[in-house]
Amino acid sequence: MKADQENLPAGYASLLAEIKDRIRSAQYEALRAVNKELVKLYWDIGRMTTERQATGVHGTAVVKRLAADLQAEFPGIVGFSWRNLFYMSEFFTAYRDKPKLQPLVAIIGWTQNLVILQRCKKPLEREFYLRMTARFGWT
């Protein structure tokens, strides 16, 4: 193995380090894109279920059935429990009339959004933690 390293051209180590950094950067950006799309999906599901519930068409039993049907259709995907569907509705309801907060909730992860939503009951407190999480990556 050491003989192989001796035959490498000058600059190989820096090339390898640069490629590794680029791979890690791409992995991080891909994860951020996936998280952003997941939050958008949960927002949309929350919107759809909230709008149906507002018309009196759906209640707890329907949400539980939705959860069971979604879990059956997408068995490898976590996040479609009836409790999480309720969180999605709560998430949408909390921010639907807050256009300046919507870009913030879109860029932080679902778990971070849930923690802020559940622990911060005052709008200004939520806004503070959303901004700090988005800016500094608080977890």
Ranges and model annotations:
Residues 1-139:
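Basic, low-complexity intrinsically disordered segments
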